[in-house]
Amino acid sequence: MGTLLTFEPPAPHLRAALLARCGIDVGEAAATRAIRAEIAYYRAHLHTGGDAAGLAALRRASAEAMRPELGIDADADVLTAALLDALRFHAFPEVPGALRELRAAGLRLVVVSNWDVSLHERLAETGLAPLLDGAVASAEAGVAKPAAEIFERGLALAGVRASDAVHVGDSEVEDVAGARAAGLRAVLLSRDGRGDISSLDQLRSYSSLW
């Protein structure tokens, strides 16, 4: 997610959503703990969200993971809706322009992400989908990074060989090591400055790779 997309701090939005939907005012600390619990549950179970039914069940269960931290008796549907209200994704500022520049250079762009089936919806909502040639979500593919198989899915979608591809990601294990093991070249994007690049527009300095 940290390569293309980020999200606004969700705890304040969760508090506002619960207040609006069921009149319950939870504290900031409780909301923060609840979001952490939800994220932990989601990461452990995102592989179950490979279709619409699985995604609905995953969202409901992830919302339920917040309940012990919130200490409230809200309806499950309300809690799930509040969670979805709280998750507000957007692209990092430089990303749309960087993607346009890469496409103008003749490159095919495919997202390979450890995400549920809603990845496609998120890319559309944030305006990135028209700038891409496709996306592979791990929950749909049935395999996650760093496994070679998910990179192979991305290569097939892009219509290129591994030796002709460059993978950019924010995880040394899932992205860099995984991509290299699958035969791709890899660039580590770390927005804290500890990677090869700290923003996607800096990828132009690696143009020799393609």
Locations of the language-model features?
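Asp-based, Mg2+/Mn2+-dependent phosphohydrolase catalytic module
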Residues: 6, 20, 29, 71-78, ...
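N-terminal helical cap/lid subdomain that shapes the substrate entry/recognition surface
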Residues: 1-96, 105
